[in-house]
Amino acid sequence: FNPCPYSDDTVKMIILTRENKKHDF
């Protein structure tokens, strides 16, 4: 059972988005 609803690719995209937001601020 995988508690994470996201696939690995989606998780990577989310992490990249968070990193980009950090750099924006």
From Swiss-Prot:
Keyword Secreted listed: yes
EC code: 3.1.1.32, 3.1.1.5
Keyword tags: Allergen, Cytolysis, Disulfide bond, Hemolysis, Hydrolase, Lipid degradation, Lipid metabolism, Secreted
Taxonomic superkingdom: Eukaryota
GO biological process, alphabetically ordered: killing of cells of another organism; lipid catabolic process
Top-level EC class as recorded in UniProt: hydrolase
GO CC terms, sorted: extracellular region
Compartments it resides in: Secreted
Pathway recorded for this protein: Phospholipid metabolism
Regulation of its activity: Activity is maximal in the presence of calcium. However, unlike phospholipases A2 whose catalytic activity is strictly calcium-dependent, this enzyme shows considerable catalytic activity on phosphatidylcholine emulsified in calcium free solution; the catalytic activity of VT-2a assayed in the absence of calcium ions is 18-20% of that assayed in solution containing calcium ions.
Family, per entry: Belongs to the AB hydrolase superfamily. Lipase family.
Note: Is about 0.95% of the total proteins in the venom.
Function description: Catalyzes the hydrolysis of glycerophospholipids such as phosphatidylcholine (1,2-diacyl-sn-glycero-3-phosphocholine) and has a moderate activity to hydrolyze lysoglycerophospholipids such as lysophosphatidylcholine (1-acyl-sn-glycero-3-phosphocholine), but is unable to hydrolyze sphingomyelin. In addition to acting as an allergen, it possesses a potent hemolytic activity on red blood cells of mice (98.8% of hemolysis at 3.0 ug/ml).
Protein known as: Phospholipase A1 verutoxin-2a
Source organism (scientific name): Vespa velutina
